[in-house]
Swiss-Prot record:
Belongs to the diaminopimelate epimerase family. The keyword Amino-acid biosynthesis applies. The active site is at C82, C233. Pathway: Amino-acid biosynthesis; L-lysine biosynthesis via DAP pathway; DL-2,6-diaminopimelate from LL-2,6-diaminopimelate: step 1/1. The gene is dapF. Its main location: cytoplasm. This is Diaminopimelate epimerase. It catalyses: (2S,6S)-2,6-diaminopimelate = meso-2,6-diaminopimelate. It is an enzyme of class 5 (isomerase). Catalyzes the stereoinversion of LL-2,6-diaminopimelate (L,L-DAP) to meso-diaminopimelate (meso-DAP), a precursor of L-lysine and an essential component of the bacterial peptidoglycan. Its EC number is 5.1.1.7. Homodimer. Substrate binds at N14, N73, G83, N84, N170, N206, E224, R225, G234, T235.
C-alpha cells in the first residue's frame, strides 16, 4: 500500500489532483500505473468528488525548467497539454521555489509561466504560455481534404457551420455560433462522433462552440477529448481566442476576455519574426484542498482532506460571470 499526498486544484473549475512525484517518491511509476491511479481517484463517485484528471509534477528532463507537468485524464488517457492545469502547476512550482516567473516542461514544449495581477476578489492568478501553435493537418491529425482548415464549411461534419482547426499542441476544432445553436444538441452529437472511431480525426479532437459577446469578449463551451463537456478548457479558450483575433483582424497583443461555465480568463497572442504564434493564458490557479489517499491495486481510499478558503473567493468571480452572461442571452 502506498500513501499519496495531493493538492486538489482548479483552473476555471477545470479540476485536478496535483501529485508531486518526487515528494511522494513515485517517480518510478509506469505510465500504466499513473493511468490506473487517475482512473480510480478521478471517479466522480469517489469520496473526494473525483476530478477531470491528475497533474503529475516531477523533475524536468532539461536543465532550465523548474519542473515538468504530465497530464492524465480521468479515463486514463494522456493529454499533451492542459492550459488550466498548467496555471496551477505554475503556482505550485513557483511557490515551491520562491519565484515569480520561470519555465515549465510539458510533453511538447518548454513554456514560460509567471505570477500575474489578480483577476479580482484576491484570486491567485497566473499567466502561462500556450505553444506551439500549428495549423497543418498532420499536427492534429486531421483528414478533411484540406491541409489547413480555417473558417470553412465541411459538409461531412455539418452542412452549415464553418470550422477552423488548430493544434496548441493538442487538437482543437472551433466554430462560431449563435445562442440557438448553443442551445441545441449539435455540439454534443458532433463531438461524440469525432471522439469515437471516425475517418476525420483519428486521434479525436476537442470541439468548441464559440459565441461572440462583444469586440473584446467571447463565450466558449468545449467538449474535451477523453473527458466530455467540462467547465472550461484552457487550451481551447486560447485556441478560440486566436481564431477570433484572426477572423476579426484584432490586434494580437490586446487581451481578449474569455467567458465559460467555469469563470473568466484573458488571452493575448504574439507573432515572432519567424511568423510563429504563441498565446498567453491568464487565469486563476485555485488550491481547493490538500490531503492524502492510500493506493492499493484495486482501491484508492481517502485518508485526509483539508479545505482551503480559496474556493469561496473564486465563487465570487463565478457569481459575477453568471450575472454577466445572463445579460448576453
Amino acid at each position: 500500500m502506498a500513501t499519496i499526498h495531493f493538492t486538489k486544484v482548479h483552473g476555471s473549475q477545470n479540476d485536478f489532483f496535483l501529485v508531486d512525484e518526487e515528494g511522494n517518491q513515485i517517480m518510478d511509476w509506469s505510465d500504466a500505473k499513473r493511468a490506473d491511479f487517475a482512473i480510480k481517484l478521478c471517479d466522480r463517485e469517489h469520496s473526494l468528488g473525483g476530478a477531470d484528471g491528475i497533474l503529475y509534477v516531477t523533475k524536468s528532463s532539461e536543465a532550465g525548467p523548474i519542473g515538468q507537468m504530465r497530464v492524465v485524464n480521468s479515463d486514463g488517457s494522456i493529454a499533451s497539454m492542459c492550459g488550466n492545469g498548467l496555471r496551477t502547476v505554475a503556482r505550485y512550482l513557483l511557490e515551491k521555489h520562491a519565484l515569480t516567473e520561470a519555465k515549465v516542461e510539458t510533453m511538447k514544449a518548454i513554456l514560460d509561466v509567471k505570477k500575474a495581477t489578480s483577476l479580482g476578489f484576491d484570486i491567485p492568478t497566473y499567466q502561462v504560455e500556450i505553444s506551439p501553435v500549428k495549423f497543418n493537418a498532420e499536427s492534429l491529425p486531421m483528414n478533411v481534404g484540406v491541409e489547413k482548415l480555417f473558417n470553412q464549411v465541411v459538409p461531412e461534419l455539418d452542412a452549415e457551420l464553418a470550422f477552423s482547426a488548430v493544434s496548441v499542441p493538442n487538437p482543437h476544432l472551433i466554430t462560431f455560433v449563435d445562442q440557438t445553436v448553443l442551445d441545441s444538441d449539435r455540439q454534443e452529437t458532433l463531438a461524440s462522433y469525432l471522439n469515437s472511431e471516425n475517418p476525420y480525426f483519428p486521434d479525436g479532437v476537442n470541439v468548441s462552440f464559440v459565441k461572440r459577446l462583444s469586440d473584446d469578449a467571447i463565450y466558449v463551451r468545449t467538449f474535451e477529448r477523453g473527458v466530455g463537456f467540462t467547465n472550461a478548457c484552457g487550451t481551447a479558450m486560447s485556441a478560440c481566442s486566436l481564431i477570433k483575433k484572426m477572423l476579426d483582424k484584432d490586434t494580437f497583443e490586446t487581451p481578449l476576455n474569455v467567458y465559460n461555465d467555469g469563470g473568466r480568463v484573458q488571452v493575448t497572442a504574439k507573432k515572432d519574426e519567424a511568423g510563429d504564434i504563441s498565446l498567453q493564458l491568464i487565469g486563476n490557479a485555485t488550491f481547493v484542498s490538500t490531503g492524502s489517499v492510500s493506493y492499493e491495486s484495486d482501491t484508492v481510499t481517502e485518508l485526509t482532506n483539508e479545505a482551503t478558503p480559496e474556493q469561496a473567493q473564486y465563487q465570487e468571480l463565478v457569481k459575477e460571470v453568471k450575472e454577466f452572461l445572463k445579460t448576453t442571452e
